[in-house]
């Protein structure tokens, strides 16, 4: 087939007419210095703070120090292939992470990349890691309870949806157990949970993930893990990635529980980065903005007003102390930011009181207004009773001649301590908590031997499940305390069938 000259010229003419001259201008720089996960870059004059920088090897970095002649960048990945003189370029993007329902049930790193071997996360939605916290007028007061399933917390230091409650204590005092049990208790609470593991051993994270999977809690949980083997920048951004994922659900009107385990390791990672970036050190060698590091994170937990959907983020940050020193720099910072703290004491833990909650030093500043009426009524005097028992206990060690009133208080105190003990991974519904605490405060346990208290509680819960379902359902649905007669008849009837152990 012959091609006519006119056709060729017409084709060329149309191509020339449609040709658009495009020039892609990319801001590039050069690596001046590299080492310890930090790169000094020359030439990126217009870079933004917190912008992602792309290296020749494809690894991304985060712009931190913006100076006149160079930029300090923390590298988010392996940096063995990055050399002095390498070309780097701006991306024009602030760091973002993938968000959405597709992440539920997955284990991801702080960049949102899956690390559980179950294929890619198929979500197109992203959110910036750093975001301004919700404003004052967009919030509402905390008025809904978040039940942890742990008697000592729900009775003494109640937590409300949208609250920030610190869990603080020495290593090996059960801080993570309290957080995991709280996640397990959200199974029927319509709450999405996010567990952020910061600087933990991979084996520990794996064990926690398996526990969540066995209990069916992974069906409503996202795990964000920056392990001890990851570079310091990953530990630094992990909590911000977790809360960005949580905000997606909060602004969709859902309730979210987020656990930061633990912020001490994040502060240490930030200190490491700051010292490598030559920022001036302050108290305990932390940089001057270590307070802002945690305040801008924890302020993102909120209870939104009804106009914005009424969603919430409840934060449970964990802080590890050294030898019970809660007056150290980072612990005091986080205590001042949060709405209360649960203080776990190693002395109590090793004496068999678990969870090892020190009721005297634990407080919830806003959760009381969210506590259900039934619990507020039965547990109203519990904290004072426990405090006076601790005082009398130390006093009673020095003398055996105790008056009848003191002896009764001591006996009641022993039973209170026993009731507040709880096995790990066995959260208790709030209605069952109300039942046993009512029995305690009204004196129904005074004639039960201390060694039988745990068995009494277990058998009472089993008995109530089949014989007092209406009573339990009334507490569960209304939150109010049923009439005393209903409680009294139920507990009295059960006590007839309970057999005390032989002395």
UniProtKB/Swiss-Prot annotation:
It comes from the Bacteria. The keyword Ion transport applies. Residues 114-135 are annotated as: Disordered. The keyword Transport applies. The record marks 362 as: Required for activity. PROSITE patterns: ATPASE_ALPHA_BETA (PS00152). Its EC number is 7.1.2.2. Keywords: ATP synthesis, ATP-binding, Cell membrane, CF(1), Hydrogen ion transport, Ion transport, Membrane, Nucleotide-binding, Translocase, Transport. GO terms for cellular component: plasma membrane; proton-transporting ATP synthase complex. It is an enzyme of class 7 (translocase). It is found in: Cell membrane. ATP binds at residues 169-176. InterPro entries: ATP_synth_asu-like_sf, ATP_synth_asu_C, ATP_synth_asu_C_sf, ATP_synth_F1_a_nt-bd_dom, ATP_synth_F1_asu, ATPase_a/bsu_AS, ATPase_F1/V1/A1_a/bsu_N, ATPase_F1/V1/A1_a/bsu_N_sf. HAMAP family: ATP_synth_alpha_bact (MF_01346). F-type ATPases have 2 components, CF(1) - the catalytic core - and CF(0) - the membrane proton channel. CF(1) has five subunits: alpha(3), beta(3), gamma(1), delta(1), epsilon(1). CF(0) has three main subunits: a(1), b(2) and c(9-12). The alpha and beta chains form an alternating ring which encloses part of the gamma chain. CF(1) is attached to CF(0) by a central stalk formed by the gamma and epsilon chains, while a peripheral stalk is formed by the delta and b chains. Produces ATP from ADP in the presence of a proton gradient across the membrane. The alpha chain is a regulatory subunit. PANTHER family: ATP SYNTHASE SUBUNIT ALPHA, MITOCHONDRIAL. NCBIfam families: atpA, PRK13343.1. Belongs to the ATPase alpha/beta chains family. This is ATP synthase subunit alpha. The lineage of its organism: Bacteria, Bacillati, Bacillota, Bacilli, Bacillales.
